[in-house]
Structure formats: C-alpha cells, structure tokens
C-alpha cells in the first residue's frame, strides 16, 4: 500500500510525500528492489546523484536480473560526470540484458558523449531495431546525441 502510494506521489511530482510513504514501509522491506527503485526516482527528481548511485549499485547487487538497476546506476554516474564509468558498467549489464532497448540507448548516449560516434550510431541503431520509431524520435531531441547530429550522422 505505501509503495503504491509513494509511486503515485512521485508520478505527481511530489517527492516529499513519496519519501514519507516509503518511510512508513516496514524497515525490513525497505531494501527490496521495488522500494529501492522508487527511492531512486525520488532522489533523481531532486538531482541527488550520489544517493542515486548508492541506490542503483544496491539494486544491481541485490537483483542483477532486473535491468533497471543497471540503468539507474549508470545514469547516476553519467549525471556525476563519470560517463566513462557509466559506459563501462552498463556494458556489463548489456551481457545480461541484450534485448533491453533502454540499455542500448543509454550506451549510445554515453558513447556519443565520449566521442565514440561510430559506436554510438551502431548502438542507437540496435536500440531503434528493438524499440521502434519512438526511440528514433527521442534520440533526435536528446542533447547527448548533439555531437552525432552535428557530424552529419542524422538519419
């Protein structure tokens, strides 16, 4: 009940109420990956990337079969200006989740930011193959791909 309420508050943009709902969850359950995922969302909404990194790392450690932990950890690293680390760690997640469009997409973003334009294009193509035209539209508006589009790679 509290987890669902926290998710609802987070979707409404009220991170304080979401946090209060999570605090009402029994202490022994607060480390559950579902709870951690919402907690990550709360801290991401207020750009507390150090906390997001801790939570994302815990998610990967507790449940490596859940792809969102890999995404959350690498995104926090990227936001902390540790994009090379984000890229390398997310490549580990790709070994387990090679059919997840968001992993391919984020790897493409990080590759582009790192100046690896050929890799970025290939990874973005794979993300589009998996996720369709919506992925392509999102990429066209993503500032992480600016270097790819400036170099004439727009398709």
Predicted regions and their residues:
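Alpha-helical segment of the N-proximal tetratricopeptide repeat
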Residues: 1-45
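"A position-specific structural signal for the A-helix of alpha-solenoid helical repeats
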Residues: 4, 38, 72, 106, ...
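Register position in tetratricopeptide repeats
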Residues: 11-12, 45, 79, 113, ...
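Boundary/linker segments of alpha-helical solenoid repeat arrays
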Residues: 33-34, 67-68, 101-102, 129-141
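TPR/TPR-like (Sel1-like) alpha-helical repeat modules
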Residues: 112-135
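A conserved position within tetratricopeptide repeats
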Residues: 26-27, 60, 94-95, 128, ...
